[in-house]
Amino acid sequence: MASVISSSPFLCKSSSKSDLGISSFPKSSQISIHRCQKKSISRKIVSVMAPQKDRSPGTTGSVKTGMTMTEKILARASEKSLVVPGDNIWVNVDVLMTHDVCGPGAFGIFKREFGEKAKVWDPEKIVVIPDHYIFTADKRANRNVDIMREHCREQNIKYFYDITDLGNFKANPDYKGVCHVALAQEGHCRPGEVLLGTDSHTCTAGAFGQFATGIGNTDAGFVLGTGKILLKVPPTMRFILDGEMPSYLQAKDLILQIIGEISVAGATYKTMEFSGTTIESLSMEERMTLCNMVVEAGGKNGVIPPDATTLNYVENRTSVPFEPVYSDGNASFVADYRFDVSKLEPVVAKPHSPDNRALARECKDVKIDRVYIGSCTGGKTEDFMAAAKLFHAAGRKVKVPTFLVPATQKVWMDVYALPVPGAGGKTCAQIFEEAGCDTPASPSCGACLGGPADTYARLNEPQVCVSTTNRNFPGRMGHKEGQIYLASPYTAAASALTGRVADPREFLQ
């Protein structure tokens, strides 16, 4: 066991790989995956450990020098046999995503630098998703979508998820919603690839075992023209989470726990690689929550080794060939952190920083004005299922306004169509109505980042809000004096019922 370096009884860290005892993992957890195509994926995947040693250098990297997952992905994308942290390399990009906030600027820079009549490097590798400032009367926000539409038509962009009827999102079959959830649902997230996006939470896609990170408009403009980007290879921190997940915890609790341990600067320009038995037990949506917030710790990217859960999700959404990679047994990590998840409690991040961690039960005297359930972090189908489960178990009505913003059209439909397990066939929407919540809103980023004054559920007053979103900086959801407590859907729902920050164990046993 590694030495304890924190006052927390749940965390151990070792500065060397040998201290961690890699050899203690059972041999049966090794895996063997060859190049994957739809319907031809190995079913022998049982864990997330390094591949067997008889693999060729072409798929495992250097035999003498081990590499991490991120290093292998970047080595392959740069056509090198070996890369090490600190290397500056030109990387071939598999997918570039942009949205209505940054898309016009990225295309503008592309035209300025490459010429008004220049063509993008590959119109089938660019994904354009309106999602931020959508359902608003703000003319400038609406103009951004118009500009993207013009560029996508001109460039024959295949994957432009357009919206034209702002009064009825369901009248727009191409419209999806929040980019990071839509990317996964539409099959753009694939193990072993490089995915870049003009949004800091692009790191969400690392849940699929790929290198995914956010970039600025200037870099995006260059990628539009060349399909390449200059990157510095990041060192990798490893987070090993073991133990049975308590029924009252969610991935949001795990990532808030981690950020609280290492701080918002603790992973600056580093990869955060997650593994362990707890990670293996998580669904894809929960893994997405985990990777979504690595940037709140300063991380360059987050990554989870792909396993059967990953491949089952991906193969049902794409026919594009992909090749998973895994960290070598002799790969170098700059730090190892180990958590016993079975001993963790529900947590929140108090204003005004994601690392201002506290136990939910320690904040029981904090009165709140509203609850917000939504965003790329906490607006997925399983997030709403969790909130509905708690509401149903409690059998009570909310004491504060509770706003629900599904991330995508698919999530919105799931809220109205899928029965909540153990609720007698009731859907989320039915349970939310019985609990007195607001009607689920049109899918978008909504009030997560404030937005125009008429944005649904925006904090226009200095109120206290419990939110399933990812940031709680001053002004993040609107009013500069607003106070945001970041929490899991369970904790958010419990807080809605009590009118204060609440521990979900009050309602979940």
Swiss-Prot record:
Pathway this chain belongs to: Amino-acid biosynthesis; L-leucine biosynthesis; L-leucine from 3-methyl-2-oxobutanoate: step 2/4
Chief location bin: plastid
UniProt enzyme class: lyase
EC number: 4.2.1.33, 4.2.1.170
Biased composition (Low complexity): 1-24
Subcellular location: Plastid, Chloroplast stroma
Record SUPFAM superfamilies: Aconitase iron-sulfur domain
Any single biological process term in GO: glucosinolate biosynthetic process
Gene Ontology CC annotations of this record: chloroplast; chloroplast stroma; plastid
Cofactor(s) essential for the protein: [4Fe-4S] cluster
Region span, Disordered: 1-25
Pfam families: Aconitase
CDD domains registered for this protein in UniProt: IPMI (cd01583)
Keywords for the protein's UniProt record, in alphabetical order: 4Fe-4S, Amino-acid biosynthesis, Branched-chain amino acid biosynthesis, Chloroplast, Iron, Iron-sulfur, Leucine biosynthesis, Lyase, Metal-binding, Plastid, Transit peptide
GO MF terms, alphabetically ordered: 2-(omega-methylthio)alkylmalate dehydratase activity; 3-isopropylmalate dehydratase activity; 4 iron, 4 sulfur cluster binding; intramolecular hydroxytransferase activity; metal ion binding
Keyword set includes Amino-acid biosynthesis: yes
Reaction it catalyzes: (2R,3S)-3-isopropylmalate = (2S)-2-isopropylmalate; a 2-(omega-methylsulfanyl)alkylmalate = a 2-(omega-methylsulfanyl)alkylmaleate + H2O; 2-(3-methylsulfanyl)propylmalate = 2-(2-methylsulfanyl)propylmaleate + H2O; a 3-(omega-methylsulfanyl)alkylmalate = a 2-(omega-methylsulfanyl)alkylmaleate + H2O
Tissue specificity field: Expressed in roots, leaves, stems and flowers. Expressed at low levels in siliques.
Residues annotated as binding [4Fe-4S] cluster: 376, 445, 448
Co-factor binding details: Binds 1 [4Fe-4S] cluster per subunit.
Miscellaneous comment in the UniProt entry for this protein: The environment dependent reduction in IIL1 activity and severely impaired growth of cv. Bur-0 are caused by a triplet repeat expansion in the third intron of the gene.
PANTHER family: HOMOACONITASE, MITOCHONDRIAL, HOMOACONITASE, MITOCHONDRIAL-RELATED
Function: Catalyzes the isomerization between 2-isopropylmalate and 3-isopropylmalate, via the formation of 2-isopropylmaleate. Functions in both the biosynthesis of leucine and in the methionine chain elongation pathway of aliphatic glucosinolate formation.
Assembly and binders: Heterodimer of the large LEUC/IIL1 subunit and the small LEUD (SSU1, SSU2 or SSU3) subunits.
UniProt family annotation: Belongs to the aconitase/IPM isomerase family.
Protein name in the entry: 3-isopropylmalate dehydratase large subunit, chloroplastic
Gene: IIL1
